[in-house]
Amino acid sequence: MLNLNELKSGFHYFVMGWHFITQKGLRRFVIIPILLNTILLCGLFWLFISQISSAIDWVMNFIPDWLSFLSVILLTLSILTILLLFYFTFTTFSGFIAAPFNGLLAEKVEKMLTEENINDDSLVDIMRDVPRMLAREWQKLRYSLPKIIALFLLSFIPLVGQTIVPVLTFLFTCWMMAIQYCDYPFDNHKVSFDIMKTALGNQRTQSLTFGGLVTCCTFVPVINLLIMPVAVCGATLMWVENYRNDLGFNMNRSFSSQTGLDVRSENTGIVK
């Protein structure tokens, strides 16, 4: 069910992301994600332009003759599906490459909001976190890949593949964008992936609104070059205002006496 308050808050966090990237003290942490985003988007655009014609012809071959009168609508939906599949490719590569930089940006935004340190600022501490961040990106890929394959297989079904699948693909993309960018502040506190999904799912309208705005802006020229750090900043604000206290954290990473839970465990989510 649509929650209007969550709809507004999802929009609010996205807008605030734009505010944060202009803040003094954060700009130098924003530059690297923007440069990486620019390189990856240029590569994706070249790949899309070179392959779009063949991809459209391939998809349209699955439309039966008796639906030819809907060809324009179905063609549009097919192109949207292809765009979203290319987008998945982009986010997968960008997630792995930019993870350490996005994690650092999320850490600095949270420090600005709370005036409390999460980790040491030493290079050794940052490098120590890189393997964990990359493992987390692999975990997100393992979560999304079976669903992407399922949507891909559904696209072979006449009519369903050109009508329902684009809608499902868009909704799933919105959900994955919320997971992708909210994961950076969650992971900085070593919150398990499953607990993060549950937390975001408890405010699903907010998550889908935020992820939907990120997804849509990715297809807008110039804006898409900035969207990665914007999304990280907005997602970090969302974490601080919605989840940080509810998950029972203090900045010494001890678990809350109120819940008795430590959400840092990757295996069970509970420390006995």
Swiss-Prot record:
Question: What InterPro entries is this protein classified in?
Answer: CysZ_sulfate_transptr, Sulfate_CysZ
GO CC terms of this entry: plasma membrane
Q: What keywords does the record list, in alphabetical order?
A: Amino-acid biosynthesis, Cell inner membrane, Cell membrane, Cysteine biosynthesis, Membrane, Sulfate transport, Transmembrane, Transmembrane helix, Transport
Tell me any Pfam family this protein matches: EI24
Where is this gene product found? Cell inner membrane
Query: Does the UniProt entry include the keyword Amino-acid biosynthesis?
Result: yes
Indicate where this protein is primarily found: membrane
Q: How does it sit in the membrane?
A: Multi-pass membrane protein
Locate the transmembrane regions by residue number: 29-49, 66-86, 148-168, 219-239
Entry similarity comment: Belongs to the CysZ family.
Main function:
High affinity, high specificity proton-dependent sulfate transporter, which mediates sulfate uptake. Provides the sulfur source for the cysteine synthesis pathway.
UniProt name for this protein: Sulfate transporter CysZ
Which species is listed as the source? Haemophilus influenzae (strain 86-028NP)
